[in-house]
């Protein structure tokens, strides 16, 4: 079951502007590198998606700290919903500037939804408008970045053929949404820390790179797919160990419980 945050502004860690810069600049840089470099280096699109996913998870952390309840998963899903619309629109009309056009379109969509959430629905969260702009932008970059991993390019026709028409877009929607919504959901509470939360975002984003790496084998070949998977596994292992270290740091005690007792032992 999901729960909201503590009912106020998220505290501690890197300032939002720093995470935003990492997500937006890193996301776009990875997408363009993955597009222009040979297919073997399409994992750069995945690295861009990781940057964007961390940004999205931090935005969810900040807005959900005001208390969204079961809206924590919902806001992650809406980020990818906005992202798909903005990504396909921008790539279809923007040409080489497609990712940038998509990013701008996402910001506009996010702003509209943020205003509706606060002014019409009356959620009353001070940063809702800004957070929805950030979450929409991050979701869009995640969609495009993971599409580059699979298709090797952000060319609209190839993305439609190799990502949308065969249904991989649904896969990206789920794994991208989980990477944005799950980190705060897994760490929420009065002792939530930004570094612990965002380490989960990196870990989930690495899993997304691994999964899309497998999907890329059908179009890009085994060498490119192998590199995508290898990079994802390395990042996942690093992020998981960082997360485990943060858990031990923040826990009162880490103990082994052993195996669950059998029915006979409980009698």
From Swiss-Prot:
Annotated TM spans: 19-39, 40-60, 75-95, 96-116, 131-151, 162-182, 221-241
Keyword field contains Translocase: yes
Example of a GO cellular component annotation carried by this entry: plasma membrane
Keyword entries, A-Z: Cell membrane, Membrane, Methanogenesis, Methyltransferase, One-carbon metabolism, Transferase, Translocase, Transmembrane, Transmembrane helix
UniProt catalytic activity: 5-methyl-5,6,7,8-tetrahydromethanopterin + coenzyme M + 2 Na(+)(in) = 5,6,7,8-tetrahydromethanopterin + methyl-coenzyme M + 2 Na(+)(out)
Localization in the cell: Cell membrane
Enzyme class: translocase
Pathway listed: One-carbon metabolism; methanogenesis from CO(2); methyl-coenzyme M from 5,10-methylene-5,6,7,8-tetrahydromethanopterin: step 2/2
Claim: Phosphoprotein is one of the keywords in the record: no
Signal sequence annotation: none
Domain of life: Archaea
GO terms for biological process, alphabetical: methanogenesis, from carbon dioxide; methylation; one-carbon metabolic process
Membrane topology label: Multi-pass membrane protein
UniProt cross-references to InterPro entries, sorted A to Z: THM_MeTrfase_su_C
UniProt GO molecular function: tetrahydromethanopterin S-methyltransferase activity
EC code(s) of this entry: 7.2.1.4
Pfam families found in the cross-reference section: MtrC
Subunit architecture: The complex is composed of 8 subunits; MtrA, MtrB, MtrC, MtrD, MtrE, MtrF, MtrG and MtrH.
Family membership noted in the UniProt record: Belongs to the MtrC family.
Biological function: Part of a complex that catalyzes the formation of methyl-coenzyme M and tetrahydromethanopterin from coenzyme M and methyl-tetrahydromethanopterin. This is an energy-conserving, sodium-ion translocating step.
Protein name: Tetrahydromethanopterin S-methyltransferase subunit C
Organism annotation: Methanosarcina acetivorans (strain ATCC 35395 / DSM 2834 / JCM 12185 / C2A)
Record lineage: Archaea, Methanobacteriati, Methanobacteriota, Stenosarchaea group, Methanomicrobia
Gene: mtrC
């Amino acid at each position: 079951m999901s729960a909201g945050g503590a009912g106020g502004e998220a505290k501690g860690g890197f300032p939002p502007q720093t995470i935003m810069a990492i997500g937006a600049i890193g996301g776009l840089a990875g997408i363009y590198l993955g597009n222009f470099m040979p297919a073997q280096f399409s994992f750069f699109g995945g690295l861009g998606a990781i940057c964007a996913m961390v940004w999205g998870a931090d935005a969810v952390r900040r807005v959900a700290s005001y208390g969204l309840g079961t809206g924590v998963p919902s806001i992650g899903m809406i980020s990818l919903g906005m992202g798909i619309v903005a990504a396909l629109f921008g790539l279809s009309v923007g040409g080489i500037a497609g990712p940038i056009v998509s990013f701008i379109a996402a910001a506009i969509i996010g702003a509209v939804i943020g205003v509706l959430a606060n002014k019409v629905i009356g959620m009353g969260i001070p940063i809702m408008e800004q957070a929805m702009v950030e979450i929409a932008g991050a979701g869009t970059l995640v969609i495009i970045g993971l599409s580059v991993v699979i298709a090797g390019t952000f060319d609209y026709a190839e993305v439609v053929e190799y990502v949308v028409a065969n249904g991989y877009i649904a896969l990206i929607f789920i794994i991208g949404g989980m990477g944005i919504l799950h980190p705060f959901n897994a760490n929420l509470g009065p002792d939530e820390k930004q570094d612990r939360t965002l380490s989960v975002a990196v870990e989930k984003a690495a899993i997304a790179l691994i999964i899309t790496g497998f999907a890329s084998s059908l179009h890009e070949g085994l060498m490119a797919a192998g590199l995508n998977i290898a990079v994802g596994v390395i990042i996942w292992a690093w992020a998981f160990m960082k997360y485990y270290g943060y858990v031990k740091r923040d826990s009162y005690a880490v103990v082994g419980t052993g195996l669950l007792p059998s029915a006979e032992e409980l009698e």
